[in-house]
């Protein structure tokens, strides 16, 4: 689930279903925050995590089951259309997708046996996602980066770790690459 930051909308999706027909909904809220109505929509894949880009032009989702990243363009009312980008790296257990404050990159952490932290350039106008080189930021062995948060003023990204039950901090370089600073 995620909320639109400037419209009274919530986005929800199931975690499973037939490809391209995964049930989801846009929930319209009343002024007091209560449910007004909803509109059923279909997503390519079930998403364990949804987030919007900086300009609120696209909603991004990652699937824990098949590991795919999907980017959907939003119309003027905030309703997702068909995916404009789908990335399938052949990994499972993606856990989160959350763009940095400048909106220029996408980072997708994978846990368990698929240990990876994939990094991409992001074009907020088109929703296009392009791998950085190297694509994998190589999280510390046994860490399992799960969810992330950005420092409000510094180029730092923090990940909670599922396997290591800890915290890893990364410095975000000017080119978008993540470099491990601490693993505690």
Model-identified regions with their sequence ranges:
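Beta-rich, blade/repeat-based domains predominating
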Residues: 1-5, 19, 43-58, 88-105, ...
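Residue position within the beta-strands of beta-propeller blades
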Residues: 12-13, 61, 108, 159
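Beta-propeller domains
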Residues: 13-34
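Short glycine/acidic-enriched loop and turn motifs that connect beta-strands
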Residues: 16-20, 65-68, 112-115, 164-166
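Short loop/turn segments immediately following beta-strands, especially the blade-tip
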Residues: 28-33, 72-79, 120-129, 170-178
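A short beta-strand motif characteristic of beta-propeller blades
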Residues: 36-41, 82-88, 132-139, 182-184
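A generic, well-ordered mixed alpha/beta core segment in the N-terminal half of proteins
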Residues: 39-76, 83-86
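Loop-centered beta-sheet repeat module
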Residues: 107-165
């Amino acid at each position: 689930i995620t909320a639109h930051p400037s419209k009274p909308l919530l986005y929800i999706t199931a975690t499973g279903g037939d490809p391209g027909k995964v049930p989801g909904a846009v929930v319209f809220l009343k002024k007091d925050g209560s449910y007004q109505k909803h509109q059923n929509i279909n997503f390519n894949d079930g998403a364990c995590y949804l987030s919007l880009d900086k300009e609120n032009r696209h909603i991004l989702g990652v699937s824990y089951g098949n590991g795919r990243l999907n980017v959907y363009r939003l119309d003027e009312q905030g309703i997702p259309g068909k995916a404009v980008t789908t990335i399938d790296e052949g990994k499972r257990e993606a856990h989160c997708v959350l763009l940095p404050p400048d909106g220029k990159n996408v980072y997708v952490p994978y846990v368990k046996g698929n240990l990876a932290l994939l990094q991409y350039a992001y074009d907020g106008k088109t929703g296009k996602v392009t791998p950085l080189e190297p694509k994998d930021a190589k999280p510390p062995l046994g860490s399992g980066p799960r969810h992330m948060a950005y420092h409000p003023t510094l180029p730092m990204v923090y990940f909670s770790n599922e396997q290591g039950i800890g915290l890893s901090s990364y410095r975000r370089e000017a080119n978008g690459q993540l470099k491990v600073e601490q693993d505690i």
